Curated annotation (Swiss-Prot):
It catalyses: L-homoserine + ATP = O-phospho-L-homoserine + ADP + H(+). This is Homoserine kinase. The keyword Transferase applies. It is found in: Cytoplasm. Keywords: Amino-acid biosynthesis, ATP-binding, Cytoplasm, Kinase, Nucleotide-binding, Threonine biosynthesis, Transferase. Belongs to the GHMP kinase family. Homoserine kinase subfamily. Catalyzes the ATP-dependent phosphorylation of L-homoserine to L-homoserine phosphate. Pfam families: GHMP_kinases_C (PF08544), GHMP_kinases_N (PF00288).
Length: 315
């Protein structure tokens, strides 16, 4: 397959995600309507040339090289499709803050896969892109909803194949995500977790996951309250999030149905009914302020369409 013409341009829009949703450690995640935007352009240059220009919402510009996740994902597409690498520029508008537990790394991986694939007229099917995304990320709960949208449960079957289930999310259940002005890396958050957990904790999580999924499907308040409970990772990670437990308590007192660490943190997800959204948001921001942490708590919707791309060559 020949390289695309110089100047060909693809825009990819990728949603943020909230993963480890309640008891769904490393298997359950949902896409949210906060996006990173990537523009891929075929440029002149040698096959090892990859220009990455990132613009954050605060106007800062950064550059990245071949070690960047976008480039690594693009390489996976070229290898899988037996395509000779070519010079590529990726210009990124960042709205999803990094190291906040909102799947910023997943957006880079998914965008690199989709962009590199689309600019070659999509030789790889979406199923293959999902497989590559999970392989690069190491776990599925961010990249799968980021690519597909909605609430996704992903598990490895007895045949070692990944099985993905799109789960229902009732319209009455809304999300507030409190995003602090502090960072927490996934690697740091994983280091505090034990290698083994009691069987009773695993059983508790399995039961809670069943309750939560049924509650989200039906909009049943009580099932959500009882299901938003975790014993596998949150007990070990709360200590890494300054003021986190106080923020959780404030959200629940303001009427949230449940609260959880978003991804590896430090952002905190609250589930609530629509009429409680403003109160929950204000309570979470105030609680973090009392701990000396600046934050914002936007009211985000579950995004159901996943990542999108289109050809904008000549524009």
């Amino acid at each position: 397959m020949s390289s695309p013409e110089v100047g060909k341009k693809i825009i990819v829009t990728v949603p943020s995600t909230t993963a480890n949703l309640g008891p769904g450690f490393d298997c359950l995640g949902a896409a949210l309507d906060l996006y990173n935007e990537f523009i891929f352009t075929r440029i002149d240059g040698g096959r090892d040339r990859f220009d990455l220009i990132m613009e954050s919402t605060d106007g800062n510009h950064l550059r990245g090289g071949p070690e960047n996740l976008v480039f690594r994902a693009a390489q996976k597409v070229w290898e899988s499709a037996n395509i000779k690498p070519f010079a590529l520029e990726a210009r990124v508008k960042l709205a999803v803050p990094p190291a906040r537990g909102l799947g910023s790394s997943a957006t880079a991986i998914v965008a690199g896969l989709i962009g590199a694939n689309a600019i070659m007229n999509s030789p790889l099917p979406k199923e293959k892109l999902l497989e590559l995304a999970i392989d690069i990320e190491g776990h599925p709960d961010n990249v799968v909803p980021s690519l597909l949208g909605g609430l996704c449960l992903t598990a490895r079957s007895s045949s070692q194949r990944w099985r993905i289930i799109r789960c229902d999310w009732h319209d009455s259940i809304k999300t507030v995500v409190a995003i602090p002005a502090i960072r927490l890396s996934t690697s740091e958050a994983r280091r505090v977790m034990p290698k083994n957990v009691p069987i009773s904790d695993a059983v508790t999580n399995m039961g809670a996951l069943t309750l939560l999924l049924n509650g989200l499907k039906t909009g049943n308040d009580e099932l959500i309250k009882e299901g938003m409970f975790d014993k596998l990772h949150e007990p070990y990670r709360w200590k890494l999030i300054k003021g986190g437990l106080e923020v959780k308590d404030a959200a629940l007192q303001a009427g949230a149905l449940g609260c959880a660490i978003s991804g590896a943190g430090p952002s905190i997800l609250a589930l609530c009914k629509k009429d409680k959204g403003r109160e929950v948001s204000q309570a979470m921001v105030k609680a973090w302020e009392n701990s000396g942490v600046a934050s914002r708590a936007p009211y985000l919707n579950v995004q159901t369409t996943g990542s999108q791309f289109r050809d904008i060559s000549g524009k």
